[in-house]
């Protein structure tokens, strides 16, 4: 565990390409080995071990796919970042240890292919001069300090998670969190900081994200029309049968995760519209955002709507000033209060703690139980990945044992020690992504999406174990590092014109 997380941490901190990619390779190889050891005696893995031919065929297929992807990314430099963001939310149900886990299999393949491509370009004798760390890695002293602390805190998060697995109440879950989420996402962060981000490339990412969002929205509309779900038909389908409304989850296992990614896409489009000139492209972006908003409404995800509002207010603050954002926030609160009073929803669903707990799917009990867990072990916590197991053993058995709040999860699992890393990480991350974000649509989009992501994690947890956090930090770290603008023609006039003349072009593009 320490080898996998430690390797990823070294990859984040290292400046020497040989050390960086060597450590990253160790992390990526050890992680699946950890998972294999964790599920060694499960029926499915025993079956694979008894059939070496099937196991060899599976490994060969993965290797061929990674090699093909690496070759493609080598020939098409923009392929890795655009593809990574396009597949960022795609999860496939996989049987792990007798349970169904929704894993980011497409993203894992993209990360592995990108790692192979970048490592070859950095280390191969003939390719050594073809790729160098972008100029954004040599910023001014003030920016360098913030970026350095960001990298240190991310590395500390990985190492601490590995150490606190030693006494975890659920070692198996900790291994899965590290191997399936923390380690590959840390490697993705490293790769994204290697990319020379240009306005053209960022425009391509926005188009890809919006396109994937439209596909997800279309699936959600089909589910709503058919009153049926394509994936994760268990508890959610039963819940839909008990309520007057019908929640869709598209190709996601959870409507809240579906809503999270729709909210992020809408915020990114809003940032583009805030800086764009002309009529055609902004109108098109607005139409796409409207479709995504309609799909978001069908998720009935309160947390996602709150995150969306936070992200949009961040866009307003960066584009027109904090005063307008505060006014917009006050208007939203006033409209919400009027709605609750007129509709009677506040009295019916939120009038008592019991009703509020029922309306929020048991989150009140989970949060209260999480706070009790923090109080029982305030210094070192119950160990990495242990919230569910500790809650079931020491609080009560429940269908859902996730705190739905990242700070409470960190406090319960890792105690005050973990919070000493988590809180500074949040603060430094905000400093990095917000610094200079008002200069361009690109910086504003990354910063506002990060704010939305952070707010969503306060109501639904999953922050460091969500690839969007690491991806936004990877791009934000480069955009925050000023450098001379490149001499290039943007992909489209719409993307090129996103920043009006009074504002300088973004530092890293």
Per-region residue spans from a language model:
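Transmembrane alpha-helices of multi-pass inner-membrane enzymes
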Residues: 2-11, 33, 113-117, 443-456, ...
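Long extracytoplasmic/lumenal interhelical loops at the membrane interface
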Residues: 230, 343-368, 372-376, 380-414
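Aromatic-anchored transmembrane helix interface
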Residues: 56-58, 108-109, 150, 154-157, ...
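N-terminal signal-anchor transmembrane segment
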Residues: 1-8, 14-123, 163-167, 453-455, ...
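Alpha-helical transmembrane segments of multi-pass inner-membrane proteins
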Residues: 1-10, 27-38, 65-67, 112-115, ...
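A conserved mid-to-late transmembrane alpha helix and its immediate loop/hinge
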Residues: 254-256, 293-298, 366-371, 377-380, ...
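Membrane-interface helix-loop-helix junctions at transmembrane boundaries of multi-pass membrane enzymes
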Residues: 72-80, 118-152, 272-287, 319-328, ...
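Interfacial loop-to-transmembrane-helix boundary motif in multi-pass membrane proteins
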Residues: 20, 26, 74-81, 138, ...
